Swiss-Prot record:
Belongs to the ATPase gamma chain family. It is found in: Cell membrane. The lineage of its organism: Bacteria, Bacillati, Bacillota, Bacilli, Bacillales. GO terms for cellular component: plasma membrane; proton-transporting ATP synthase complex. It comes from Staphylococcus saprophyticus subsp. saprophyticus (strain ATCC 15305 / DSM 20229 / NCIMB 8711 / NCTC 7292 / S-41). This is ATP synthase gamma chain.
Length: 288
């Protein structure tokens, strides 16, 4: 058991830390609500895009657009979504662990894949592990706009369009609920047959000019960019939820430590008082 001064110092420092983690919990809670709202508001746009894809591509099974063509996978591109900041529990670790596991199982050479990273944490981790990073985007806002992440989405799509890779996959943490987030993988290129038939068919009676292939060349890249953006919004909600939970757990642990230290402090104080009384009584007896 430490001295009264040492225990008191630890109590004060732990209380300060609790104030910080509690404040961070409240901030993350606010950011989570906004992130959930952003993802919800983006869904109608995606549904309309899917309607357009269904109308144009769903009725034309002979489309030769590269984004709809399945080809032999010789090289893959992995878009990895992580956070720029820490204190987010296992949010980054789970996604990066999932990525590395797949790379080790599927690829014998670094020439077989390219990695594009969102978030400083992912950049630092992969560089320290010796992985080459083709491109990256850091300092991503907590509530990113489409324009702020469009450039990195275009680069990932460009790798596929230019024939440098044969598929593009996203590794991210999927937001299920405040208490549940799942490391997930999504293939965004090539688009599967299901992707061209997800709409509600509300545009099937339209005529398209100049022709469907020309329209597909415009809307398919926009659609894939939207898929990537929607996934980033999902991952951001997961990040805020994980950080909120981590800060709550840290605050709860700080409370337990403060309680334990308070008990130690009271015991030490009681022992000191008892010792003083004993010395006084002993001194009185000696004077008699």
């Amino acid at each position: 058991m430490g001295s009264l001064k040492e225990i008191d110092t630890r109590i004060k420092s732990t209380k300060k830390m609790k104030q910080i983690t509690k404040a961070m919990n409240m901030v993350s809670s606010s950011k989570l609500r906004r992130a959930e709202s952003n993802a919800k508001q983006f869904r109608p746009y995606m549904e309309k895009m899917q309607d357009a894809i269904t109308a144009v591509a769903g009725s034309d099974k002979n489309s030769r657009h590269p984004m709809l063509q399945q080809r032999e996978v010789k090289k893959s591109a992995y878009l990895v979504i992580t956070s720029d900041k820490g204190l987010a529990g296992a949010y980054n670790a789970n996604v990066l662990k999932h990525l590395i596991k797949d790379i080790e199982e599927k690829h014998a050479s670094k020439d077989d894949y390219s990695i594009v990273v969102l978030g400083q944490t992912g950049v630092d981790f992969l560089k320290n592990k010796g992985y080459d990073i083709h491109d990256s985007l850091i300092d991503v806002p907590d509530q990113p706009s489409f324009k702020e992440v469009q450039a990195i989405a275009k680069k990932a799509i460009g790798l596929y369009s230019e024939g440098e890779v044969d598929e593009v996959k996203i590794y991210f943490s999927h937001f299920v609920s405040v208490l549940e987030n799942t490391p997930s993988t999504k293939t965004v290129l090539p688009l599967s047959p299901e992707d061209s038939s997800l709409g509600h068919g509300q545009m099937s009676s339209y005529e398209f000019e100049p022709d469907k292939e020309a329209i597909l060349s415009v809307i398919l890249p926009q659609y894939v960019e939207s898929l990537i953006y929607g996934t980033i919004l999902d991952a951001k909600a997961s990040e805020h939820a994980t950080r909120m939970t981590a800060m709550k757990n840290a605050s709860d642990n700080a409370s337990e430590i403060i309680d334990d230290l308070s008990i130690q402090y009271n015991r030490a104080r009681q022992a000191a008082i008892t010792q003083q009384i004993t010395e006084i009584v002993g001194g009185s007896v000696a004077l008699e």
